[in-house]
């Protein structure tokens, strides 16, 4: 019996994707996607015709998982639509590609391409949970959104209701 034959579908929940797991819980693999489309119809003054267009704004596929009791995790996320904002600018197809290690509870070391903790608060919200379809123009123009580098993130509870979440980031600066 091979190990591949023992992989089971652990769970499926709409919005969370499908999760495959080892029977002993040693590793998990999650596959999920996100699709956002736009259809516009316009009629200009002095013109009797309607102009329409259909756009695939976001078409994202994400593969993530963990192993060794959650000590090691990874994420690979792509955007096949390559649309950035509402102005048709092209962005990179690869959004996230990183591996993370948790040596102790509350501390995570990551290496690769991922979102940075140094951007404004709006960029900490994922695209599929925004209140409006687009981010603000300020965030689109001035946010770095994702960087390649080494990330050290902490999360330490202080008292009953507060957390201290320090971050240290060394990136390529693009």
Enumerate the language-model features and the residues they cover.
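Short coil-to-helix leader/linker segments, especially the first N-terminal amphipathic alpha-helix
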Residues: 1-19
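Outer membrane beta-barrel
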Residues: 17-173
């Amino acid at each position: 019996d091979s190990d591949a034959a023992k992989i089971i579908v652990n769970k499926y929940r709409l919005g969370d994707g499908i999760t495959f797991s080892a029977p002993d819980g040693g590793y998990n693999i999650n596959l999920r996607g996100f699709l956002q489309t736009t259809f516009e119809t316009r009629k200009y003054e002095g013109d009797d015709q309607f102009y329409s267009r259909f756009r695939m704004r976001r078409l994202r596929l994400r593969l993530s998982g963990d192993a060794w009791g959650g000590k090691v995790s990874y994420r690979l996320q792509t955007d096949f639509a390559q649309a950035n904002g509402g102005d048709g600018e092209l962005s990179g197809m690869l959004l996230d590609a990183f591996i993370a290690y948790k040596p102790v509870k509350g501390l995570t070391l990551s290496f690769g391409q991922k979102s940075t903790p140094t951007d404004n608060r709006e960029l900490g919200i994922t695209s599929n949970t925004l209140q409006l379809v687009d981010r603000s123009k300020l965030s689109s123009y001035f946010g770095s959104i994702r960087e390649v580098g080494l990330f050290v993130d902490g999360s330490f509870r202080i008292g009953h209701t507060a957390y201290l979440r320090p971050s240290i980031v060394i990136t390529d600066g693009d």
